[in-house]
Amino acid sequence: DVILIGFSQGAMMSMQCLLINHEKLGAIIGYSGALREENIDAANDKILNGKHKFSDTPILLVHGEQDEVVPFQSLAKSKNLLNSIGFNVQTLSRQNLAHGIDPEGISKGMDFLKSLK
């Protein structure tokens, strides 16, 4: 299985690939990224009865609360948008982290990967 892991714009690209890809991905880990409603709209052909055809794909989103590049509120918005089309999203917020990745985020990502079947 292909697992996409991205930071900032890479996280955004990973989530977009998940939504529009014609093949199922193994998982997504996104650090300090964001998803917009337009991204969901671009996947309309993959959404049936309000649920994305690959909504069982595991997703972890990690974001720093002090992020000034991609606002921290993007974490909840991205999660809610993905939830709205059937995805179950795990999240981790990092209290004193700006736009970056810290050891706790890496550790959570590793634990997430180890939990995949």
Language-model segments: what does each one mean?
Residues 11-22, 28:
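Short glycine-enriched nucleophile-adjacent loop
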Residues 60-63, 67:
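Short beta-strand/loop motif that positions the catalytic acidic residue
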Residues 28-37:
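Active-site nucleophile loop of the alpha/beta-hydrolase fold
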Residues 76-117:
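C-terminal catalytic histidine-bearing segment of alpha/beta-hydrolase fold enzymes
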Residues 1-6:
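Alpha/beta-hydrolase fold nucleophile elbow
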Residues 54-59, 85-88:
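Short, proline-enriched alpha-helix->beta-strand connector loops that line the catalytic pocket
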Residues 46-56:
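Short, conserved loop/helix-junction motifs that constitute active-site signature segments
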